[in-house]
């Protein structure tokens, strides 16, 4: 009988919502390193070179290693590539590196058998290890038929495990949302439950066979699906007496700022809850460029260790595994069913006009200082003690001003008339006082701030305290950073990581990013909107779901991404998948409007949703064909 998730219980077996501790996992021995347990969170990447080209693979692997990579993965799509891992391994060892090498296998279990002879770890994909490649067809299985399919997996997987035991080879059970088998999809749907069950089917065999050098990954280009699936996996493993180490990554994250922000939202949300033993940031860039991004994320979250305890009580109705948006009453355009708002600072009297209309903040905070010019129709937040004075000035005609109060000014809220009022609160403010205030003033939006070492736990604590009191005032999370403009990437990673769990938990009615440094205000605004889009909460631009490339990619991926972006960047709200090959292509493009997928050497197939509409187009004209397809659908 297949495993059933049955009735869901709200359990907190693995996670303290308010206090950071790293999840206790077993240890996987992978060549010269150990992964999991008390070992450092390992950083890794994957080559993009042809695995039959030994020299190129050795060179690129060593670039990754020199950048700080602790594991290096190679695509092994056939037995020839798997056999050549022997030469690649020898070349890297001859240069004095003992870094473990990982073979990435899809579709062919025989290739995994060969790779296990020459690599320290082999990744297999449950979606295509024994199950045939998905065709997105509907097929009902009886329990007996389903059990027969599971037996087929065990009959093929156990001999592979025996090879791994003999050669001291570790494995990764790597589930990709985009390559779930039709069997799983038909039984569980395209859901986190299906993703987790796909993984557990293989883990149960490992446990039964007493094979413990196992690492697990669950990846998706959808950050919400990725985080919820990994949370559910942790919970289900605990129920079944498993605690294997976890590999984190957002697949097909893209490149540049968008790729970094999307990766940080997903990976950061899990790391902040103590989940994760190794990280790969999948960027459509040079593999070595992934390493410092992953390292900064891991180090940033690691600063939470040893923080002062946050004594808080979780709201009983909150479901960490399947969170829904916290119920709030709309105050103006904040909360209720409104998309989360963006608040931004302009406190030095500078212009409040915004060049990027798609990243214009919903509210601009100006403190107590008049800007050079008020923008017609723009919402402004001003300090409560100058609100009435500024609101009466003729210069503000056509603009909308709203007061903000610090916690100590709560008694004055009733004396000032405004449709929307803002109140800054931090966990630890006397609860009786602020709860009474918020109950009396439903027009107040809470600005949740924190200077705690673990600001995620601190900010969660305030909102859970509000939920326990039955308050329905909207909450905007405000975060302060200190970075110069040369540290823009660090700012974006930290902000996305801090906001990730809060957004996926359904607690966010708005975000307010601040920086004590010279990062331009427009960059901060664009980052805020990018974070909301990465968390699937608000769309402000074209979205690109692009893979990082690997040895299977047979066209110039980065050049193609640049061409497609340049030609489609004005198509706000459109999702375009750009995939090197068909391994995850159609699946990871599940909610993409269009897809550009490698089909062979310099050949591309085009998709509308998950349906292939043009096959094997020459690469040199494929972008033009994609644009023509998009244009034809507009008509």
Each language-model region and where it sits:
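Conserved, mostly hydrophobic/aromatic
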Residues: 43, 104, 173, 216, ...
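Extended, intrinsically disordered, low-complexity segments
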Residues: 296-345, 367, 378-412, 419-422, ...
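Catalytic alpha/beta core domains of metabolic enzymes, predominantly
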Residues: 140-153, 184-334, 420, 429-571, ...
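Short, acidic/polar
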Residues: 52-63, 108-112, 263-267, 350-356, ...
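N-terminal amphipathic alpha-helix/helix-capping segment at the start of soluble metabolic enzymes
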Residues: 14-45, 161, 165, 303-350, ...
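Glycine-rich phosphate-binding active-site loops on the catalytic face of alpha/beta enzymes
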Residues: 70-71, 119-135, 273-287, 506-519, ...
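Active-site beta->alpha loop and helix N-cap motifs at the rims of alpha/beta catalytic domains
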Residues: 16, 69-201, 344-355, 360-456
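Active-site mouth loops of central-metabolism enzymes
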Residues: 40-56, 101-108, 184-196, 252-261, ...
């Amino acid at each position: 009988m297949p495993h059933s998730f049955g009735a869901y219980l709200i359990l907190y077996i693995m996670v303290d919502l308010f206090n950071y501790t790293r999840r206790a996992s077993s240890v996987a021995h992978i060549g010269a390193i150990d992964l999991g347990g008390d070992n450092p969170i390992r950083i890794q990447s994957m080559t993009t070179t042809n695995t039959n080209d030994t020299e190129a693979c050795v060179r690129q692997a060593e670039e990754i290693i020199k950048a700080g990579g602790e594991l290096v993965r190679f695509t092994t799509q056939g037995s020839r590539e798997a056999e050549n891992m022997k030469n690649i391994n020898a070349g890297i060892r001859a240069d004095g590196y003992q870094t473990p090498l990982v073979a990435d296998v899809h579709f062919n279990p025989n290739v995994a058998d060969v790779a296990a002879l020459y690599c320290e770890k082999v990744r297999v994909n449950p979606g295509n290890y024994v199950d045939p490649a998905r065709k997105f067809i509907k097929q009902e299985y009886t329990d007996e038929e389903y059990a027969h399919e599971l037996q087929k997996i065990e009959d093929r997987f156990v001999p592979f495990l025996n090879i791994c035991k003999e050669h001291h080879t570790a494995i990764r059970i790597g589930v990709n949302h985009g390559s779930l088998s039709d069997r799983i999809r038909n039984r569980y749907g395209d859901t986190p439950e299906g993703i987790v069950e796909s993984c557990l089917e293989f883990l149960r065999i490992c446990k039964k066979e007493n094979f413990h050098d196992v690492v697990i990954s669950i990846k998706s280009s959808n950050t919400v699906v990725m985080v919820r699936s990994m949370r559910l996996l942790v919970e289900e493993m605990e129920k079944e007496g498993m605690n294997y180490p976890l590999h984190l990554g957002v697949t097909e994250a893209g490149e540049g700022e968008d790729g970094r922000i999307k990766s940080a939202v997903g990976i950061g949300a899990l790391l902040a809850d103590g989940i994760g033993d190794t990280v790969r940031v999948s960027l459509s860039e040079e593999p070595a460029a992934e390493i410092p991004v992953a390292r900064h994320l891991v180090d940033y979250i690691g600063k939470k260790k040893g923080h002062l305890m946050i004594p808080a009580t979780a709201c009983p109705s909150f479901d960490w595994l399947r969170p829904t948006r916290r119920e709030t009453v709309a105050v103006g355009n904040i909360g209720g069913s409104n998309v989360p708002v963006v608040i931004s600072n302009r406190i030095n009297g500078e212009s409040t006009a915004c060049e990027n209309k798609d990243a214009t903040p919903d509210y601009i905070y100006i403190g107590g200082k008049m800007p050079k010019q008020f923008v017609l129709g723009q919402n402004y937040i001003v300090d409560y003690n100058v609100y009435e004075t500024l609101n009466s000035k003729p210069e503000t005609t056509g603009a909308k001003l709203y007061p903000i109060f610090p916690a100590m000014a709560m008694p004055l809220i009733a004396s000032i008339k405004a449709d929307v009022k803002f109140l800054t609160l931090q966990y630890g403010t006397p609860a009786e006082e602020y709860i009474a205030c918020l109950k009396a003033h439903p027009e107040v939006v809470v600005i949740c701030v924190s200077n705690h070492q673990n600001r995620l736990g601190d900010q969660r604590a305030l909102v859970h305290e509000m939920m326990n009191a039955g308050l329905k005032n909207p909450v905007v999370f405000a975060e302060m950073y200190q970075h110069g403009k040369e540290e823009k990437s660090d700012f974006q990673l930290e902000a996305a990581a801090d906001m990730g769990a809060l957004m996926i938990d359904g607690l966010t009615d708005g975000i307010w990013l601040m920086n004590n440094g010279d990062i331009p205000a427009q960059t901060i605004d664009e980052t805020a909107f990018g974070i909301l889009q990465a968390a699937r909460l608000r769309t402000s631009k074209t979205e690109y779901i692009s893979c990082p490339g690997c040895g299977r990619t047979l066209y110039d991926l980065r050049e193609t991404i640049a061409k497609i972006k340049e030609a489609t960047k004005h198509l706000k709200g459109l999702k375009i998948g750009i995939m090197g090959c068909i391994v995850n292509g159609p699946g990871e493009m599940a909610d993409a409007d269009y897809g550009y997928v490698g089909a062979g050497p310099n050949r591309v197939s085009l998709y509308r949703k998950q349906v292939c509409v043009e096959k094997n187009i020459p690469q040199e004209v494929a972008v033009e064909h994609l644009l023509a397809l998009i244009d034809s659908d507009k008509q």
